[in-house]
C-alpha cells in the first residue's frame, strides 16, 4: 500500500507542477480521492511554500457540472473514465494533459462492530441485512459500478430495495462507520 501511495503522490505532484508551475492551483477531485489529494497538496505546498492549493471534493458528476458552469479548475480527477470522457467532449479539459494515474477497486464494507457474516455478494439478500449504502447510480461512479456489479450477479433488484443512496463514497463510508447501515459499497 505504501508503494501505491508513493506512486500516486509522485504522479500527482508531477501533474500539479505541470498544471501550475509552482503557482496557486485549484483541484476538483472525486470524494474517494480526498485523503490522497490532501496528502499530495501538503507535499506540493512543502515543495512550493508560496503556492496555495484549493481542494474541492465531491461526486464526479457534480464536479463536472461545476466545471461546465464556469468553476475555475486547474486539475480535475474523476472517479471514473466516463466522467473524464464527458469533460473532454465538453472541452473542459485538454486531452493532451489527461493522465490516468490511479485506479479504484469496488469493495463491500461493514461496520467494525458488525456480527454479519458477509462473504459473498449473495449474502446481501439475507433478511438481517436491512440497509446497504450505495452511491446514487445516476450521479456517483461508485453507485454505477455497484449497480453494474450487482446486475451481473443478478442481485440488483433485491439489494437496491435495501439501498440507502448516498451523494458520494465518503458519505457511504460515514454511514457504515456510524453503523447507520449494515453494509456499504466503497472504493478500496
Residue ranges and their predicted role:
Residues 1-3:
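N-terminal secretory signal peptides that target proteins for export/translocation
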Residues 6-17:
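Bacterial N-terminal signal peptides
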Residues 12, 22-48, 52-61, 65-69, ...:
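Exported/periplasmic ABC-transporter solute-binding proteins
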